[in-house]
């Protein structure tokens, strides 16, 4: 039986990944999901990249997943004169309306409600927190006066963060709506929503998806605002997955607080049995260098040991010099640590009697039985993918092999920890079905003759209902 990694790798598309050969090599080295960053995406380019991925994935029979990452509300200043340096105590005016070239006294702000939303005493962060300002006054129309707290070089088009301010800007912008509609037409597998603040943001995107397709496209909430941390329980109840977006999160809150927040978010995601992705600056030195720093190796390893479903690469693969090598390195780190006994696995069984209580309980006990008898695989039949999420969350030692006649979820499930999905549509009888899927597991190299498997099915099998049966088989 070959050893396969269970923690998934998400790689961001870009100029460095435009070649079908590079895409093929990346998949073979361990990429499970390709991310489209709509902050830097031309629709015709994206369409071509998706076409390449699907063609390569089909040839490799890899079920590679596609994640559309919406930009969200990006606040920026306008162009400024060259060579401006600000010192602590300097005063500066932020102004919206007609665009202009800024100087050391006044800069353009692209957010029209900036002066209405901010209040005196709140902080304005510029250029990933390199410059910090405190709001002195606002006319509530177009002008905000601020004082420099932390100075530095003032550069054009830099991003703005408002950690203390409740923005009236929706999480789903006009650009996001256009990009989301395009992504839906492309049949992407997941959509990530940036700068989520509350559950209403998730519902807005859900409603948009429902208006344009009858198929479920799961939503990942990107956690990068203090408001999201405050509302995390409600957000989790509405979304289908989390992304710990440490870049903006580490600007909006003190960076020293991010590690514990990351661990807490992973823990909450596992409790809700939804996937969680750790993102941003994981192996950033490999954009230009063939080797990762020791700190980066530790970061990836610790994210895996925290229990992340996936670890994500951004610039490393989109614009980096070594998109294939960085996947090799990340896969190597995952293989080295993901079977460590130091990793803690959630143990508390489901106790809320919902409609799916029986299925949840069977999935929980299937994992414990599989670990107990040292089964090499848990094989489950599913039409919605629900049992895959449930089994994965309990982190079994065995492979999780999912068999489905629903082609839509084959690629969606490629994001989920430990899951490998196969198309299967022959539902004659329970005995025949179990025999056939066990043979597929053996033929694909996941089990050998004499190995034990745990089979999860719904009886009667032709109804494709909720899982209600657990069975231990010998290959």
What name fits each language-model region?
Residues 1-475:
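Non-catalytic helical/linker scaffolds that mediate oligomerization, partner binding
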């Amino acid at each position: 039986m070959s050893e396969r990694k269970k923690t998934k790798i998400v790689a961001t598309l870009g100029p460095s990944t435009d070649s079908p050969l590079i895409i093929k090599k990346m998949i073979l080295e361990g990429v499970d999901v390709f991310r489209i960053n709509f902050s830097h995406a031309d629709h015709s380019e994206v369409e071509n990249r998706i076409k390449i991925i699907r063609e390569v994935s089909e040839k490799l029979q890899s079920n590679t997943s596609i994640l559309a990452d919406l930009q969200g509300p990006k606040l920026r200043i306008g162009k400024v004169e060259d060579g401006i340096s600000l010192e602590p105590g300097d005063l500066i005016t932020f102004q919206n309306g007609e665009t202009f070239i800024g100087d050391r006294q006044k800069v353009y702000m692209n957010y029209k409600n900036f002066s209405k939303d901010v209040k005196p005493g709140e902080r304005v962060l510029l250029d990933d927190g390199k410059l910090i300002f405190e709001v002195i006054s606002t006319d509530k129309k177009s002008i905000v006066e601020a004082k420099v707290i932390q100075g530095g070089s003032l550069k054009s088009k830099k991003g703005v963060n408002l950690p203390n301010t409740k923005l009236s800007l929706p999480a789903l912008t006009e650009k996001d709506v256009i990009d989301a509609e395009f992504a839906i037409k492309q049949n992407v597998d997941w959509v990530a929503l940036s700068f989520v603040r509350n559950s209403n943001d998730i519902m807005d995107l859900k409603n948009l998806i429902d208006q344009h397709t009858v198929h479920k496209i799961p939503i990942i909430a990107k956690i990068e605002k203090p408001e999201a941390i405050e509302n995390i329980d409600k957000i989790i109840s509405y979304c289908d997955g989390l992304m710990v977006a440490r870049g903006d999160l580490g600007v909006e809150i003190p960076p020293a607080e991010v590690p514990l927040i990351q661990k807490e978010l992973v823990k909450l995601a596992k409790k809700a049995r939804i996937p969680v992705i750790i993102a941003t600056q994981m192996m950033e030195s490999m954009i230009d260098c063939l080797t990762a720093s020791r700190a980066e190796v530790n970061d990836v390893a610790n994210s895996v040991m925290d229990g992340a479903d996936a670890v994500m690469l951004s610039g490393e693969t989109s614009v980096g010099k070594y998109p294939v090598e960085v996947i090799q390195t990340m896969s190597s780190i995952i293989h080295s640590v993901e079977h460590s006994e130091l990793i803690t696995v959630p143990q508390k069984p489901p106790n809320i009697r919902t409609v799916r209580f029986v299925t949840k309980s069977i999935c929980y006990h299937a994992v414990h039985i599989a670990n107990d008898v040292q089964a090499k695989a848990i094989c489950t039949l599913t039409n919605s993918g629900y049992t895959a999420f449930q089994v994965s969350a309990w982190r079994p030692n065995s492979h999780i092999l999912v068999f489905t006649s629903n082609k839509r979820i084959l690629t969606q499930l490629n994001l989920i920890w430990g899951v490998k999905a196969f198309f299967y549509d022959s539902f004659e009888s329970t005995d025949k079905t179990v025999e056939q899927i066990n043979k597929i597991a053996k033929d694909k190299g996941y089990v050998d003759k004499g190995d034990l498997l745990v089979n999860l099915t719904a009886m009667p099998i032709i109804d494709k209902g909720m899982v209600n049966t657990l069975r231990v088989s010998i290959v």
